[in-house]
């Protein structure tokens, strides 16, 4: 049976996952709630500077955007509790405004009639986080869940493969992350993060991230063993994780690469990738895998200390796994 989905917040992630959902037979987007008018929503969906023109026929009226003749209801309601999820028989709401990251806030979608809620960002309280390749199998029917962050979706599968095979002692992660909509194009005020207010096009900007710590929440065996930071860089999309890790079971870099390659073909298929090509970031634009290991970019100091590199499209890969989580929560 098709899962009826409503999207609250039609920003970068909302639009990318909408495009991806059009390729899936198990998910149907029924409604979008955003403060933008249907005309502007249709325009932003059709034309995208990063992912190109959307190859569907798009029109609109005062209450809908229309994709290949199919109406998708559009509303502009600020309070999630007042949304019409019940009237539209919505099974799962994707909460992608970036604003409602606490249980009490996300629960308003349940009060409005949705059966389940998937939050597209790391939760700010006890909303459980689920990452494909890490802990999807532990889902027990919770009504409100988080898909964590794009960086956690890259780091967690890689960390699990290393920990399962070699036993992680401790590690530090750096993500070299593409610019996002929260940054300033030129220098501007950012009271909570002074460096974050500097011009995104002109600077490499050090930043904090909870992505590595969040791995310990989806993989409890790694709790307290990983932490990390970010550099925001002037590219529009695609990011890369640098995981420097110490592990128990001695192994050469080649042996580690072999285990990662095997995992990408078996238990991590559809999640992790493996490449020995001379790749750069734009080669992964539009990639739905969330962690593509770059064998030629990493190195080892000895048989217990290694640097591992994995690429990810921080928009497409993450959005793909949000839809996988929607599919998961609809079944229990």
Swiss-Prot record:
Record's subcellular location: Cytoplasm
Catalytic activity: D-glyceraldehyde 3-phosphate + phosphate + NAD(+) = (2R)-3-phospho-glyceroyl phosphate + NADH + H(+)
Active site: residue positions: 150
Residues holding D-glyceraldehyde 3-phosphate: 149-151, 180, 209-210, 232
Keywords (A to Z) from UniProt: Cytoplasm, Glycolysis, NAD, Nucleotide-binding, Oxidoreductase
Matches recorded under SUPFAM superfamilies: Glyceraldehyde-3-phosphate dehydrogenase-like, C-terminal domain, NAD(P)-binding Rossmann-fold domains
BP-aspect Gene Ontology terms: glucose metabolic process; glycolytic process
Superkingdom per UniProt: Bacteria
Recorded family membership: Belongs to the glyceraldehyde-3-phosphate dehydrogenase family.
Protein name (record): Glyceraldehyde-3-phosphate dehydrogenase
Native source organism of the sequence: Buchnera aphidicola subsp. Acyrthosiphon pisum (strain APS)
């Amino acid at each position: 049976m098709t899962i009826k989905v409503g999207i609250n917040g039609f920003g970068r992630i909302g639009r990318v996952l909408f495009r991806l959902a059009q390729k899936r037979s198990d998910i149907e987007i029924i409604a979008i709630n955003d403060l933008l008018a249907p005309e502007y929503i249709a325009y932003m969906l059709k034309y995208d500077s990063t992912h190109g023109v959307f190859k569907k026929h798009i029109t609109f009226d005062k209450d809908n955007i229309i994709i290949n003749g199919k109406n998708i209801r559009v509303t502009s309601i600020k309070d999630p509790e007042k949304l019409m999820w019940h009237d539209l028989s919505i099974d799962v709401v994707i909460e992608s405004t970036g604003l409602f990251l606490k249980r009490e806030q996300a629960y308003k979608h349940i009060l409005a009639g949705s059966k389940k809620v998937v939050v597209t960002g790391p939760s700010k309280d006890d909303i459980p986080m689920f990452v494909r390749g890490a802990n999807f199998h532990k889902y027990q029917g919770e009504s409100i869940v988080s898909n964590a962050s794009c960086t956690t979706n890259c780091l967690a599968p890689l960390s699990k493969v290393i920990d399962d095979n070699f036993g992680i002692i401790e590690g530090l992660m750096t993500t070299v992350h593409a610019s996002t909509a929260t940054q300033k194009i030129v220098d501007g005020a950012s009271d909570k993060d002074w460096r974050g207010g500097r011009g995104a096009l002109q600077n490499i900007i050090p930043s904090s991230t909870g992505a590595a710590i969040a791995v310990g929440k989806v993989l409890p065996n790694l709790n307290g063993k990983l932490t990390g930071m970010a550099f925001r860089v002037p590219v529009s999309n695609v990011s890369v994780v640098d995981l420097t890790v110490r592990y128990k079971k001695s192994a050469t870099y080649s042996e580690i690469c072999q285990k990662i390659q095997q995992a990408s073909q078996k238990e991590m298929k559809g999640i992790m990738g493996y490449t020995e090509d001379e790749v750069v970031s734009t080669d992964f634009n539009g990639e739905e895998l969330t962690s593509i290991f770059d064998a030629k970019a990493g190195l080892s100091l000895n048989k217990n200390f290694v640097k591992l590199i994995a690429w990810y499209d921080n928009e497409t890969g993450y959005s793909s796994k949000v839809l996988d989580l929607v599919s998961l929560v609809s079944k229990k």
